[in-house]
């Protein structure tokens, strides 16, 4: 049985969206057990599942505008903190929250803890591509600055995830840079390139450019947290703008535009479906002693369902155990 601790109070639509997503997941997956942390009375308003689910009542929650580190230290009875502590204490195997990203990252590092020999855990998410296959990218903002060795470790962690969770054979790992030549980028990029190229356990394909990301240029893209977060928000913003512009043009373009819209609707629906982030699940903080999953803050019930599905797959694949084994070997080879 896979035990997942869920912060029921995190996210823009909590607890309703979170609990409704949990209801769907419990109906779909008989091998999971959910522990809901939050206001018991509010949770019970939406909870329909009766088996393999429990509620741990909490009196506090971490808000979106709370300072992350202070929040997890001062609000010791908050739903997010107690859910994370359940993982540390062995009462749950993974934790999921749609709440304050910074607070969850801090709780992951300080409460769950890093895997030995991993310098900086990184935030990774599966982003959409035009062919529907998607690609994994990290770091997406867990760290504002990174050194070359961090990026090298992200290549290993991302490759593990793509292979064992998403089922990609020999995942292609690319380093995000301002050109494809191996001499491009800052000294950090050049050193990271060298480290990735020297490790033959990684299928490193070299530098990749941002303009090719949505065209499946790589299965795993490695970057620093500042750049990764900027790229993520650019992709999200561009997708929203394009959808808004298309629907606006059809809606306000008269009869001919509306008829044209009806004709291209199936094609548009297919294309937009390939770019839908909801089915990809949440962002994973890789490099910790247990899976810590961040669902999108605006997650609806469907998004929560897919994030639980993703968490189940991560536990099934044994990513943490494989990472522990890999990094003990990597460190020994560097001694």
UniProtKB/Swiss-Prot annotation:
Give the reaction(s) catalysed. a fatty acyl-[ACP] + phosphate = an acyl phosphate + holo-[ACP]
Q: Is Transferase found in the keyword set?
A: yes
| Gene3D superfamilies xref list | Isopropylmalate Dehydrogenase (3.40.718.10)
Per the record, the major location class is: cytoplasm
A Gene Ontology MF term for this entry?
A: phosphate:acyl-[acyl carrier protein] acyltransferase activity
Keyword Amino-acid biosynthesis listed? The answer is no
Instruction: Name the domain of life this protein comes from.
Output: Bacteria
Its EC number(s): 2.3.1.274
What does the record note on quaternary structure? Homodimer. Probably interacts with PlsY.
**Name under which the protein is recorded:** Phosphate acyltransferase
């Amino acid at each position: 049985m896979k035990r997942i601790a869920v912060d029921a109070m995190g996210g823009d639509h909590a607890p309703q969206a979170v609990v409704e997503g949990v209801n769907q997941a419990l109906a779909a997956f008989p091998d999971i057990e959910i522990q809901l942390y939050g206001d018991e009375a509010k949770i019970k308003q939406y909870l329909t599942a009766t088996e393999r689910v429990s509620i741990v009542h909490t009196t506090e929650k971490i808000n979106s505008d709370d300072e992350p580190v202070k929040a997890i230290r001062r609000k010791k009875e908050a739903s997010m903190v107690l859910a994370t502590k359940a993982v540390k204490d062995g009462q749950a195997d993974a934790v999921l929250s749609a709440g304050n990203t910074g607070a969850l990252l801090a709780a992951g590092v300080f409460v769950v803890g890093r895997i030995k020999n991993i310098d900086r855990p990184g935030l990774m998410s599966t982003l959409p591509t035009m062919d529907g296959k998607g690609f994994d990218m990290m770091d997406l903002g867990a760290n504002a600055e990174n050194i070359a060795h961090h990026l090298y470790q992200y290549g290993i962690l991302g490759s593990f995830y793509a292979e064992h969770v998403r089922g990609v054979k020999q995942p292609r790992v690319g380093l995000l840079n301002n050109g494809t030549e191996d001499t491009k980028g800052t000294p950090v990029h050049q050193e990271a390139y060298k480290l990735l190229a020297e490790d033959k356990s990684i299928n490193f394909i070299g530098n990749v450019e941002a303009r090719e990301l949505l065209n499946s240029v790589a299965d795993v893209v490695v970057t620093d947290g500042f750049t990764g977060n900027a790229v993520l928000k650019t992709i999200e913003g561009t997708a929203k703008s394009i959808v808004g512009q298309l629907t606006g043009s059809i809606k306000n373009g008269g009869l001919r535009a509306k008829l044209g819209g009806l004709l291209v609707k199936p094609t548009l629906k297919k294309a937009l479906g390939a770019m839908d982030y909801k089915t990809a699940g949440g962002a994973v903080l890789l490099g910790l002693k247990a899976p810590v999953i961040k669902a999108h803050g605006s997650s609806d019930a469907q998004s929560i369902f897919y994030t639980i599905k993703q968490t189940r797959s991560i536990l099934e694949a044994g990513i943490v155990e494989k990472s522990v084994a890999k990094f003990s070997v990597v460190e020994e080879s560097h001694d």
